[in-house]
Amino acid sequence: DFDIVTNCEPGQIRKIFKNSRIIGRRFKLVHITFPDEIVETTTFRSDSKDNEGSIEVNEKGRILRDNSWGTQEEDVKRRDFKINSLYYDPFKGEIIDYFGGIKDLGNKNVTFIGDPEKRILEDPVRILRAIRFAAKLNFSIEKSAKKIILEQKHHLYEISPARIYEEVLKLFLSGHAEMSYKILNEYKVFEILFPHVSDVNKEFEDFFLTAFKETDRRYKVGKKLNPGFIFALLLWPKIFKKSNISKNINFRNFYQSISEVTRKQQVITSVPKRFTSFIKDVWMHQPRFQRTGRKTLRFSNNLRFRAAFDFFLLRHSIEPNLKNDIEWWTEFRTANYDKKIKLLNSRGRKFAKN
């Protein structure tokens, strides 16, 4: 994994590559578009406030705008972690290591460059980045940073919900969801990202671990992962506790719970509408797995059926009473039409064959 960085300013890059465009305001960079990929290119930064681009910092030390161009030696000081501060010169074939990043790689450490508190206050998302690196690489975060993360984690509330949403996807959709979940809990950051679930988090730990193991397995075999499915998993405990998911479910209360939980989470993570619709569909289909009837055949052909069924399977880790329903649906799902009618009749539903 590498980034491309240069001493050319964004405008100069734009002139060299006509197939490029400048993006971002807080942190300007350039996307150079090729037929099969987009190459993201950044400019060396500095701490200087003298040049035209400048760097803007608020009273807490948060970097609001970072477009102050500099040299490679200045840029490396702006990096967050030592393992993230290695430069490679493609012309000389050399790795340039200013802060002992190679040593940290060997020791499997995630170490901040400079004062961890200052670096976190500059950008609280570095907390999530540290956790992501530790989860992805099976590294340890430096001990001195743990106390600071515990003290400063509340600053994540000050980050835009859209940015937090993107970071959550990186944590849970990159093949290390199980480890991300464990480290987020260790550093008590899970409760910041999902405050409305934190009170039942421990109770549903087996559900989360089972679900994230399956998520990581799907990632490793190249299966597509839906962001909506991950959020449906992460928020389900609250829906489960607020609603009686059974044959005698109160649908009015169920729908109200779904609207309330998704609305409150949007304040923290701005989930795009297409995925909130997916989340709601997966949840609203859950009672149907325990209520077979005339609409069961049509339901099994629903666009969201497979996702809802996969979700239903994961629920078994905390709802052992679903065993018979899961076995019935597993057989029903792959049966031909005649067999499906027999299975429905076995549940006391009298259906005639066409």
Regions found by a protein language model. Give the residues of each.
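Catalytic cores of the polymerase beta-like nucleotidyltransferase superfamily
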Residues: D1-N354
